Regions:
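Short, small-residue-biased leader/transition segments that mark boundaries at the very start
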Residues: 2-4
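Hydrophobic residues positioned within well-ordered beta-strands of beta-sheet architectures
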Residues: 34-36, 57-59, 126-130
Length: 140
């Protein structure tokens, strides 16, 4: 992980997307965007499952993509509370891999468990990540 020296062009991009997200759910939000950091993954590198529970939301910008690139995944820590027959009937899985590509931004609750699968390409995988805290919020 590397800190970004000048995030002045990145933060407005995330801010605009977070505002669009808030509009979609019918909320007016004032948020604090924390300084982003760069994640790089060389071949065979990965990220263990973790969360950002000390923040309301986290965001990831995907800087590049390729064949056999490491994949972001989310884990459902509540799956074990569903009876096995419900898990089978509704084909519930405890891991979900969102489809993302270069330039995509994904924003998710900070408490969600997530990780990155092993990188299998010689090209370095790059993402920018940051945390978001909600200062004020109201329903529209």
């Amino acid at each position: 992980q590397m800190c970004i020296r000048d995030s002045s062009n990145i933060l407005p991009l995330i801010s605009d997307n977070f505002k669009a997200f808030a509009d979609e759910v019918g909320a007016k939000v004032k948020a604090k965007l924390w300084e982003p950091w760069l994640n790089t993954y060389k071949k065979a590198q990965y990220q263990d499952v973790h969360d950002h529970a000390e923040h309301y939301f986290a965001a990831i910008i995907f800087m590049n993509e390729g064949v056999d690139f490491a994949k972001l995944y989310f884990m459902d820590r509540q799956k074990s509370f569903s009876p096995p027959f419900i898990q089978n009937v509704f084909q519930m899985d405890d891991v979900w891999y969102p489809r993302v590509g270069k330039g995509d931004i994904i924003i998710f609750p900070g408490h969600m468990l997530h990780g990155v699968s092993p990188h299998k390409n010689d090209e370095i995988r790059k993402t920018l990540s940051l945390n978001i805290d909600v200062i004020e919020a109201q329903l529209l």
